Regions:
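Structural microenvironment flanking redox-active thiols in thiol-disulfide oxidoreductases
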Residues: 71-112, 120-129
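C-terminal motif of bacterial Sec signal peptides marking the signal peptidase cleavage site
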Residues: 5-8
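N-terminal "domain-start" segment that seeds a small globular fold
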Residues: 16-50
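Bacterial signal peptide processing site
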Residues: 10-12
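Thiol-/selenol-based redox modules, centered on thioredoxin-like
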Residues: 142-198
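Short, internal strand/loop/helix patches
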Residues: 108-150
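Short active-site neighborhood of thiol/selenol oxidoreductases, capturing the structured segment around
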Residues: 50-71, 176
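Short, thiol/selenol-centered motifs that function as redox-active sites or metal-ligating centers
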Residues: 64-74, 98-99, 138, 195-198
Length: 198
């Protein structure tokens, strides 16, 4: 199963091209690299982040209920989840911080019919462990919690407030397809465009 984590956005922009900064994510590439943090799902049930180190591949979306691009990409989040969950990939939304209330997050999920699990990260502990800093941002983890892909969903938005009519590169979908075929993704990391997590 693949877990997609989306985090909310603030006011940052990233170029629409692979990350050439040379900086690596704090997430260790070794198996079992995600710390076991006691978090809570939006429905109130417990969520141990260490579960991401086993059982299934996961796509994590870092989300915010008022980030313009999280709103714009909501349909894409839903269609990807519907398609790939049926093939054994797990999807999870991650909401860092306490800026937005649980009611605001529930309204966002209900409005766009996002039915995969939503996890709250009030202290940014998992967000920092993942090296995520933008919403929306996507991470693809294999069954051992190893990072396969991190960055933007596609190249539809190439700057904050600037979008193409249609995306010409589909970073996350390409990574998912490569993963299913036992291959490395065409790009392992891209710079997400969106809002900085505060």
């Amino acid at each position: 199963m693949v877990l997609v984590l989306v985090v909310g956005c603030q006011s940052g922009a990233s170029p629409d091209r692979p990350d050439e900064s040379g900086q690596s994510s704090p997430l260790n590439q070794a198996a079992g690299s995600i710390p076991n943090l006691p978090l809570k799902r939006l429905d109130g049930s417990a969520f141990a982040s260490g579960s991401l180190n086993r059982d299934s591949a996961t796509v994590l979306f870092l989300l915010s209920p008022e980030c313009p691009l999280c709103l714009d990409y909501a349909y894409t989040f839903r269609t990807l989840a519907e398609e790939y969950q049926a093939r054994g990939i797990r999807f999870v939304g991650l909401f860092p911080g306490t800026y937005f209330s649980e009611l605001q997050i529930k309204k966002y999920c209900s409005r766009f019919r996002l039915e995969f699990p939503m996890v709250l990260d009030p202290d940014y502990a998992l967000t920092r462990a993942l090296g995520a800093n933008t919403t929306p941002e996507a991470l693809l983890l294999n069954e051992q919690g190893q990072l396969v892909y991190q960055g933007g969903i596609d190249n539809w938005a190439y700057e904050v407030g600037q979008k193409r009519l249609e995306p010409t590169e589909h970073y996350l979908r390409d990574a998912l397809q490569a993963f299913e075929n036992g291959q490395k993704p065409p790009l392992a990391r891209t710079k997400p465009v969106g809002c900085l997590i505060e």
